[in-house]
Amino acid sequence: MGTRMFEIRANLENEYPDVYTREALAALDVLAKFDDERKAVMAARTSRRSARFRNKERIGFLDPSATIARTSIKVQDARDGNFVGSEIPKDLQRQWIQGTGPAAKPNSPLDKSIRNIAYALLSGADGWMFDGEDALGQITTMSLDNQRNLKLAIHRDSAFMKPAEQVAAEMNQWAKGFFGKPIIEDWVKQLDFTTKIFRARGLHLEDRQIRSAKGGGFSASIVDAALFLVNNYKRLRQDGCSLCLYLPKIQTAEEAALWSDILSTLEQHLGIPDGSVKVYVLVEQIEATFQLMEIRAALGKHFIGFNTGRWDYINAVSDAMAWDKGFVNPNIDAIVMTYGYMRVYEDRVRRACVTPDKMGQKALWQGGMEPNIPVGSEAGVSAAMKKAVAGAEREQREGACGKWVAHWKMVHIVRPVWEKVGEANQMGRKFPPLTYTKADADGLVLLEPAPRTVRGARDLLSVAMQYGNAFGQGMQAAALKPADFFGNEDVLYLMEDMATGEIRLSILWEWHHKGAAFTADDPDTGVKTGDRLTADLYKRLLAEEYEKLRKASNRDVHDNSKNTTLPIAREIAETYVLDDIKLPWYVDLLNINLNNHDLTEAKRRIRLLADAFRKDGTRITENLDFNK
């Protein structure tokens, strides 16, 4: 191999030869040309955001006469379905329940780490989105452990099969206690049931183990997609499984077109037909909701469906409207999928999915996440499971082909909602065609009356700090609840990932800098209805919630984190919320402190990042410890 367009950190190429294979590295070299284009597209994203703040502008629909960047497709043609999309492969036509979660655990030996995949593939879920993004820890070499584990499982290596047999027995033991019967009959056969899907990291993130040969970061998206597909495509195709990715954080059709170019180039390099790699797009950015059909068209033969999230989308709305003093969210518990702008967003997604393309092909709508876990008191679990089933029933009625769950124990609780109906999917449902009016645009930022309370602020702050702490420990998916409910088994833990941190600090920033009025008195603080979240009040709440976490049991806050990653999480929460310049991503502040437990150094890095963004919109996204 000649001179590469990238370099790999330390001795990792030798430590992970089964991941950094010759074939995978060759593919990365072919795709490396797209990294500069990605950086340009991300710079344009930052410029649009800055312009909205500067000019106090809302996001709008595209000019119907314009051409989608990187394509020859007119916007109006995309809206009319005048493009060629994709048929839905057989193993993706019925996706009633998709589980989500990483394929690795932090600081764990292989036989423990790989168990995550066994739980997933034995769960009975129709599909499992193995996460390389928001739910996967990025400390040390977790991204490589994730890829290694997936390859071992997909290829049925003995390193996977032995733990899988043990996991099957444990799952059945739990099921007998919860359901009164086992959930797995033939564990080896069961491994073939679930469609394997991978979520790559977003275009805005850079890999921690690879950087550009020219210096600076290198696309995490390209690394994730190349390593997963190159190392597994032959076996997946041999087994009759689709090559399927979830693409996160897409904001525009141009970004979707860049993804399409990356995937088509990889397919050509591998010698497989164009469109072999299928993708779902997570609609978690408000700008994407203004360009749904354009995104479908830009991805063309790759695209099979949209997914509707909650936390990430609320965060995107909050960020896009951060300039507008009149736009203030309520407590996030009130922002459910039937609330104002969320209801309008969900409706646009389902209407985009049932719009046929030139060949009459429609797309899948995968519903949102169920974060509950059936662990707690009998009363707490019963109430939470009724709520979870009711949420699934609502989505099924609205036209979703299925939904997500964050834990394998939820599969057999929620899946019967679709199983009873019996239809593989709901692409045949009829909804009104999409329209592009001012009223449509206004609906996407529609606020409705709901509480905004000190209790809500405490919950936001407590969970945000807990999540930042978990992230620093390598657990980007974590079971969390506000500190005031520690020890209360009637209040269940929710399985949360990076989105939970993003939205919580974003809304606290919004409340503080827009002078949001509380809607109820709070006896503990003396806050009265109409009072604001001042800097002094925020610092008081921060200190009180931080102290609760410091005093919490090891079960809720790991003791070894209380003098390492927890103080850093607190520092980030203070800087993010009190800075007058709203930083675009909480994850940036966490990423630059991965593997760093020194608070003084963390403060320096946090200030470095905030000052760089304040100066000219530069995001520090590369691994500052690459040479260590």
Language-model-detected regions and their locations in the chain:
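Expand to "…catalyze enediolate/carbanion chemistry for C-C bond making/breaking, isomerization
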Residues: 2-628
